Amino acid sequence: MENIRAFLKRKDVIISAHRYGIDAMGAMAQGLFASLLIGTIIKTLGQQTGLDVLVDLGGYATAMSGPAMACAIGWALHCPPLVLFSLITVGYSANALGGAGGPLAVLIIAIVAAEMGKAVSKETKIDILVTPLVTIFVGVGLSMLIAAPIGAAASQVGTLIMWATEQAPLVMGILAVSYTHLRAHETRRHL
């Protein structure tokens, strides 16, 4: 057991709620903002002004939301370059196969693929082949297996929240504001 702990420490694989729930998710939000949200704003500006070039530009940005989120997650997890660049493919597949729940699928799958890629990185003389292969096979394989169910589950949670909001709008509003306030205090260093 000590050997495994030493190996994980050497590879900077820190399994913790803070690392995945705060660091990785916070970085993922930045990746989402830098692609999907900004792309949507640019596309909307193009539609409102009739400038097709802005509509196209916004479309390109939104299309890259999965890769942007996965790379941001990899950056937060201190991935070496070959792992980080391989996460582009992982993010694309997880987001595409995750449907409406793509961001949640990207978060879960990119974390697993990143940590597996970090584990094998620089362990062989053919690292340039092994590291991307492991990262992509793990990430795309998981995307094929679990991205759609994660997306469906996320959609069901969204449906439940909308139903609850219709039933008790005041209570749900208070919960939403309280959660946002709590997250702002937890991530104060990221504000």
PLM regions and their residue ranges:
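Conserved small/polar residues in nucleotide/adenosyl-binding loops
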Residues: T180-H190
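Alpha-helical transmembrane segments
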Residues: S143-I150
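Early transmembrane hairpin of solute transport permeases
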Residues: N3-T135, G139-S143
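Membrane-interface helix termini and inter-helical loops of multi-pass transporters
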Residues: Q48-V53, I150-W163
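Membrane interface segments of multi-pass transport proteins and intramembrane proteases
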Residues: S121-I126, G158-E166
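Alpha-helical transmembrane segments and immediately membrane-proximal extracytoplasmic
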Residues: M172-G173
